[in-house]
Amino acid sequence: MKKLFLNFCSTLLFLIFASIIRANADELFNKGKEVFLEAGNCAACHTLYDAGSNAMIGPNLNEIRPDIQRIIMAVRNGIGVMPAMEGILSDEEIEAVAHYVSISAEQ
């Protein structure tokens, strides 16, 4: 009986932590989408289907499917005609938009 109770408690704790992690990931995704569409104005130049953007100045993010590190580097430092956003966007906003783009581009 004690073992059954311990298994129940550990399963319950796992589910609680999993839901907290999921909520944080959803919050980060939504913040990233907001940055993509508004603060960063990424949609003005990039195509990303999830954001409903169909611009042709920068690369189509659905086609190149960049990983998080590549996105962070490009957003912070700029690349080609894309301006550096470090100092314009906070580190939190840069991480959020990188998270959003990396997940959305995979779909």
Residue ranges and their predicted role:
Residues E27-L48, E63, N77:
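Sequence/structural segment immediately N-terminal to covalent heme-attachment motifs in c-type
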